[in-house]
């Protein structure tokens, strides 16, 4: 069959992404030659995360075409979150459609979603990734492909700006990332939702429309719809009407540029963190703690024997860096210790570095505090040690 322009674009995008995760290195030599070749039963496996929607069905169809041409097995994993009536049937239909396309193995997993403080959307996402990672490990897949499009990227940028700020909010979703030891990739970030819809039409692939997307709702979506659905249905179209051009493409390109900046800042911050921050588990040695160099918090520095993570940050080392790097080092170090600090708390710790005039420490979540002693900032639980 003759491929449409959008289908050729998708094939190229998937092939380029597989190259990015070094899948081309495992291509069987005979698949570089013209002719019909059977994919070996023990060939490397790629899984497509499939919800049954238009984006993931388009990705499943295109990935099967590309993987087959490379001598790589292409399977699918469908996660049933159990949050909607009839979700089991939707998952089963998605699995059958993937099998009809030739994908195999096709894995259906049931997720347990437990919403806590982070909300239902975040809990469902965490549960989904848990199941995707488990499926990849159990099947031996070398990568899991996700069907996020350019439109999803634009929505992610807007959601990021609503919930946070700075270059991290603008950076959107990475094309390739690792989670719990599993490689994930997003081949369709350069394609629009209209193009994935068209690809399904080109290939005669049926798909399911999630009612929580609100596509059938006239007017503004109520607040009980997921935030992403409201951004997609209401906010993005309103911005496009105001701007008079395709803002999804604009936001997606901005995300690509911001991600390059973010990756450099993260790399540089990691280098500085390795030199400036020491992380230790309690209980530590009872040896005296130097106030000039970062090292373990001593057991005598705490009022109890509880186990936790302490940080020692070298003021002399971190003070030489620009503010953008200092703030990142502090944030990453706190995150490593399991402390989810606010932007205001991170900025207050930075003032202990660059605007030190004997001020008190900074109270942090989980009973942690950050206090400066000479040329070291100590981040420990209980905080009493810092005043000795």
Swiss-Prot record:
Domain of life: Bacteria
GO molecular function: ATP binding; tRNA(Ile)-lysidine synthase activity
EC number assigned by the record: 6.3.4.19
Entries under Pfam families matching the protein: ATP_bind_3, TilS
UniProt binding sites for ATP: 51-56
Localisation: Cytoplasm
PANTHER family, per database record: TRNA(ILE)-LYSIDINE SYNTHASE-RELATED
UniProt free text on domains: The N-terminal region contains the highly conserved SGGXDS motif, predicted to be a P-loop motif involved in ATP binding.
Designated name of the protein: tRNA(Ile)-lysidine synthase
Taxonomic lineage from the root: Bacteria, Bacillati, Actinomycetota, Actinomycetes, Bifidobacteriales
């Amino acid at each position: 069959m003759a491929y449409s322009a959008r289908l050729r674009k998708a094939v190229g995008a998937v092939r380029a992404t597989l190259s990015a995760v070094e899948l081309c290195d495992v291509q069987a030599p005979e698949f570089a030659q013209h002719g019909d070749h059977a994919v070996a039963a023990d060939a490397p496996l790629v899984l497509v995360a499939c919800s049954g929607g238009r984006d993931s069905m388009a990705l499943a169809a295109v990935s099967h075409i590309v993987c087959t041409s490379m001598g790589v097995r292409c399977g699918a994993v469908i996660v049933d979150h159990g949050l909607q009536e009839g979700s089991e049937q939707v998952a089963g239909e998605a699995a059958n459609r993937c099998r009809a396309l030739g994908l195999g193995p096709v894995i259906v997993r049931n997720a347990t979603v437990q919403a806590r403080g982070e909300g239902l959307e975040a809990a469902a996402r965490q549960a989904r990734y848990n199941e995707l990672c488990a499926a990849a490990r159990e099947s031996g897949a070398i990568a899991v492909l996700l069907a996020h499009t350019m439109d999803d990227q634009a929505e992610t940028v807007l959601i990021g700006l609503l919930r946070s700020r700075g270059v991290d909010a603008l950076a959107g979703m990475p094309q390739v990332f690792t989670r719990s030891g599993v490689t994930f990739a997003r081949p369709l970030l350069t394609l629009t939702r209209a193009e994935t819809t068209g690809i399904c039409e080109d290939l005669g692939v049926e798909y399911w429309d999630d009612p929580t997307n609100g596509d059938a709702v006239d007017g503004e979506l109520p607040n009980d719809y997921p935030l992403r659905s409201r951004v997609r249905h209401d906010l993005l179209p309103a911005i496009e009407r105001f701007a008079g051009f395709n803002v999804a493409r604009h936001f997606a390109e901005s995300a690509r540029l911001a991600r390059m900046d973010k990756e450099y800042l993260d790399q540089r911050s990691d280098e500085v963190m390795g030199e400036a921050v020491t992380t230790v588990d309690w209980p530590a040695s009872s040896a005296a703690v130097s106030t000039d160099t970062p090292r373990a918090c001593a057991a005598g520095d705490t009022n109890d024997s509880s186990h936790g993570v302490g940080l020692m940050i070298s003021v002399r080392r971190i003070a030489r860096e620009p503010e953008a790097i200092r703030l990142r080092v502090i944030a990453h170090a706190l995150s490593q210790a399991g402390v989810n600090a606010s932007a205001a708390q991170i900025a207050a710790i930075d003032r202990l570095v660059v605007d030190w005039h004997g001020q008190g420490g900074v109270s942090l979540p989980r009973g942690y505090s950050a206090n400066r002693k000479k040329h070291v900032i100590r981040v420990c639980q209980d905080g009493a040690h810092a005043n000795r």
